[in-house]
Amino acid sequence: MKLTTNDLFASQPLFHCPCSSSSRPRRRRFYGLHFPINLTSEKNNSLSIVALSDSDLPSRTAFSRRAFLLAPPLLVSAASLFLKPSVSLASEESSSATVTSPAESAAPPPPPATTTPSPPPPVNKEETITSRIYDATAIGEPMAMGKDKKKVWEKLLNARVVYLGEAEQVPTKDDKELELEIVRNLRKRCVESERQISVALEAFPLDLQDQLNQYMDKRMDGETLKSYVTHWPAQRWQEYEPLLSYCRDNSVRLIACGTPLKVLRTVQAEGIRGLSKSERKLYTPPAGSGFISGFSSFSRRSTFDMSLPTQIVPFGPSSYLSAQARVVEDHTMSQVILQAVADGGGTGLLLVVTGASHVEYGSRGTGLPARISRKFPKKNQVVVLLDPERQFLRREGETPVADFLWYSAARPCSRNCFDRAEIARVMNAAGRRRDALPPDIQNGLDLGLVSPEVLQNLFDLEQYPLISELTQRFQGFRERLLADPKFLNRLAIEEAISITTTLIAQYEKRKENFFEEIDYVITDTVRGSVVDFFTVWLPAPTLSFLSYADETTGPDSIDALRGLLGSIPDNAFQKSLAGREWNLNLRIASVIVGGLKLAGVGVVSSFAAVGASNALNIARKVIKPELVVAEKPKRSPLLKTAMVYGGFLGTSANLRYQIIAGLIEHRLSDELSSQPLLVNAISFVVRTLNSYFGTQQWIDLARSTGLQTQKSIPASKEISEALEEPTVECDTTTEEESIDKLNNQ
């Protein structure tokens, strides 16, 4: 029976896959050509052509004609299989239904693109912002902004007018510091974006604009400008002077937007009707403007708040005149602001420094933003309240009192001082639980007094087993490490200097008797190390939450003393912490208290050193009686030595270590935080010089008070003096060393 083409291909399918799990390679045969193509599924996916033996076919001549007829189509099929990439064949072997066209299969894979990595863009180092910022538009409690203040600056820069509302009932200098901080940062960003920035001040009446222009052009000094604001309180000029000087030195335009005093006093005394016709046209809103200013917008709060007795204010003649004065103030400032915005072009930024009551509730209130919003888009105005006394919980549907609440770092806070979400992230990253932290840290977190940075520093330090054990057991050690993570470096530098210089001085003095008198050497070295430890420990800055966590009860006098000591910083130059403000009196008290502590250390160490010397002398006489001499050497008086040495540590040493720990190692190290090697080198040099000059001061003091004699001593008595006289000097100098110096002279 003659086979047809259909019978040939139907008898053995092209993609026939046997179901048996044989390890042999599967073959796909094209019987018409007698060249079966073996498609193996091995790693190389190679294609091989296996020749059939003669026994596989009945005869060669029977199908020569069929071979000739089937050759062209089968050659095309074979070529397509050869041109298929190995990846497509492997996918077919794994029963994928994807069919690739020959043209697509023949296309070579594209070469891998070689992209040169572009250099990373320069990262602008953001200025450290120590103040606290809250988003007042959040529902519920105002939300603390994290350490990343980019969103705040972006919103301020996107506005055309930024209102800075100062405290009016109880003015504070912290507001002026915040204003300078905000102006400085905004001015830096406006210079980068080539925008003009101006500052409008309500404190300056608009009739003083010429004087402000002369001050900006440096044709008038500060004292002359001060003579035009004699109506200010005495301290207000000192508070405004840094802001005025910065604006003048950095070409930030100053605008006077306050109501002239004559007009304001006339309205307060007689009302608007007391103004002339021309003054009414300039300083009063047109009839039918719809604003009745001077009263709080109670509709922004709940009915419960409106019913409080403290909110009810009787309306009398004086209140009516005050309301009219408020209308005049708001209208005058709004006109100046609109003109300043127009003068600034389409991209200028205007900062308005005014009272908080003039800007509360923004465009939905009754103050400046509401008046300007009629001629100005609402989204181009941002309201910032500086150091507000209260934080309201915003309910759904209520108008926020402002866009941001901005607190100075020194202002006390009762809740949510730091971003709690950031604190939770730090806790989760470290795998720590709040109940496993020390009690003072837990209460500090509950009150919002522990920043995420401080918490991260604590976790980093606890990675070392020894430091972790010390921080968990000793609160004083933990407080100093939190305030200064390099506290151990300072302590190690001081101890290394003390021990090294003491041993060198002892060896130079005793020379060949150094090891024979090793007991005296050890006594002096240990005493100097203990004293140096406390001179580093006591003046060191601390970050303490003990006053918040300590809930123990005791006598009133003890509580009062504990509260007094808790309010005093450990170092006079320590930076103000969140919720604490240390004035000049408290910093002076810090020096006094620190001096008393070091004086106590000096008295105790003197008693201990003299007692140890006497005990060693007695033991030496018992062990080596041949060292006993007939003449008893002169000894320094015990009580006098202790009092003089305590006074020396409480005055000279206290002041020197306050400066080193506060100014050099606390404030200067923060400025040079990016160069730790330089900071450590400066600390080492300063402490070495301090040890040297401190020793010289103690020698002069000991001689002037009679603790050390200056007369010549015979050489025969030199050994007995060196063996028996107790040491009373600071750190490295002994009494015997000073005597030898005199003998050499």
From Swiss-Prot:
SUPFAM superfamilies reported in the protein's UniProt record: EreA/ChaN-like (SSF159501)
Highest taxon in the source lineage: Eukaryota
Start-end of Acidic residues biased regions: 721-738
Membrane topology designation: Multi-pass membrane protein
Biased composition (Low complexity): 94-106
Transmembrane regions listed in the UniProt entry: 529-549, 591-611
Compartment(s) where it occurs, according to its Swiss-Prot or TrEMBL record: Plastid, Chloroplast membrane
Name by which UniProt lists this protein: Protein RETICULATA-RELATED 6, chloroplastic
Source taxonomy: Eukaryota, Viridiplantae, Streptophyta, Embryophyta, Tracheophyta
Region (Disordered): 94-126, 718-745
Composition skew (Pro residues), residue ranges: 107-123
Primary gene name: RER6
Stretch forming the transit peptide: 1-50
InterPro entries registered for this protein in UniProt: Cofac_haem-bd_dom, RETICULATA-related
Gene3D superfamilies to which the protein is assigned, alphabetical: 3.40.50.11550
Keyword annotations: Chloroplast, Developmental protein, Membrane, Plastid, Transit peptide, Transmembrane, Transmembrane helix
Gene Ontology annotations for the cellular component aspect, listed alphabetically: chloroplast; chloroplast membrane
Family assignment from sequence similarity: Belongs to the RETICULATA family.
Phenotypic consequence of gene deletion: No visible phenotype under normal growth conditions.
Function recorded in the entry: May play a role in leaf development.
